[in-house]
């Protein structure tokens, strides 16, 4: 029998997976991604998991803000979690979570697919090459009300790196 490798934040990832299983058992497959995201919010609150939904991470290029990474959830400032709802999970979403990890400096992510008959969960770790590059990104949580205001009035000109 193969030996299971214990990853970073093992207890937390198990609790997140347990929450996802509870949501999937109640709702089953076939819903839109947003339904599962809301279900995870409700279940995570019920289970006492601290999380930020749709947390925005600024991305800079040569000191200029060029965009944001917006993972579905960041649990306890430690685990990035992406929710999907596909019958079969496309491989490109694994790369999305790896990119989030590489650029935030977090050590583990979860890619959870609710769309299949059975819940699909992948624990994801940053690429080894990410350690070569210093993290040059600022973590920024922007409330929903401010995001709407910023979208209505986009920034003009270059912005400095924090």
PLM region spans:
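Extreme N-terminal tail/first-helix region
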Residues: 1-11, 134, 141-152, 157-158
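Active-site metal-binding core of divalent-cation-utilizing nuclease and nuclease-like domains
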Residues: 29-78, 86, 116-129, 138-143, ...
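Histidine-centered active-site/metal-ligand motif
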Residues: 24, 31, 93
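Interdomain/boundary linker segments immediately adjacent to catalytic/signaling cores
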Residues: 1-27
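Nucleic-acid nuclease catalytic cores
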Residues: 80, 84-132
